[in-house]
């Protein structure tokens, strides 16, 4: 959520920034918010005048009673003033509700570092690691490799559940589990994150706090009778861990890593990446989440991105880092990097992690603040997160980049201790 004061003082700048985003956004709502805000402030002035008058009248009652005078007219006046104030309070509550409704639907403002552009074709590559994998045979797609090795079963998952689900079997399940452990061990032991195992269901307030609701409700799996949602990412429960709390300044930055299953309807992705592990309704992911002071957040974003890159380097998977343009930025981020791994079957790079700085956008929605000391005024933290990284897509990248002509797959060396010392899946 944006700062209403920022909108009030920089409305034209805010409109221009919102116009430059890719998603179509009606900037006239900014004028609507400002009109409601002005109406609200005018009513508050009137309420203060009425309260002052009521207090003044109220202070006269004891004196008049002591003098034996009739106070019925004054009591009646106090009652009328109270009723008038009550009416204004009702109006204010309705105005606040309207303002909140609009504010929750206004996207974040891009940081000045975000490049111009409308689609993912306008994203800018800022670095890459290793050359795309070359083969002296015709490489197969990961869904064929997995099926041939009997470690992935898409057909039976379709029978049991439906499309975009997978059974991992044998060494496929072992590979998935090994990646989860390797990612968690790396981020806790090498990078200093505290491990969290979160709930896989959250309430509506939590989804609003991180920005999934109200805009993306159609993309979420909902348990209607309880108004719970299956989490689309561990970002949601881990960020809301500190909702409505004031943190200590000397505790920041807080760094958490969480493994979870993730659930997405992929409502807007019909026809895209329908085969394999790239776009599933249920998948596993290790998520990195940070809470920082505002002046630290962009330095911490670079560190978080490097932390995610580390596991890809150690796995030996070719990848690149792209800076996302304004049109592809999404609803909540102020600046975002995507890590994309090379996928031979696609003959292109495929996203495996998004690393974002939300500045105070989520913190305002979730009311997460900090104080430098006991006497200091609370300030909103900046929140950051990034995949560290998506498990299923990593399995796909390993199967495709480490495949051999005989149909086997070499296991990356860093994973072999987790795979019982095995060197290949045959």
Swiss-Prot record:
Cellular component per GO, a single term: cytoplasm
Highest taxon of source: Bacteria
Name the record gives this protein: Serine--tRNA ligase
Protein family membership: Belongs to the class-II aminoacyl-tRNA synthetase family. Type-1 seryl-tRNA synthetase subfamily.
The reaction(s) this protein catalyses: tRNA(Ser) + L-serine + ATP = L-seryl-tRNA(Ser) + AMP + diphosphate + H(+); tRNA(Sec) + L-serine + ATP = L-seryl-tRNA(Sec) + AMP + diphosphate + H(+)
Pathway in which the depicted protein is active: Aminoacyl-tRNA biosynthesis; selenocysteinyl-tRNA(Sec) biosynthesis; L-seryl-tRNA(Sec) from L-serine and tRNA(Sec): step 1/1
Localization annotation: Cytoplasm
Subunit structure: Homodimer. The tRNA molecule binds across the dimer.
Taxonomy of the source species: Bacteria, Bacillati, Bacillota, Clostridia, Eubacteriales
Family matches, as NCBIfam families: serS
Gene: serS
Sites where the protein binds L-serine: 233-235, 287, 387
UniProt binding sites for ATP: 264-266, 351-354
EC code: 6.1.1.11
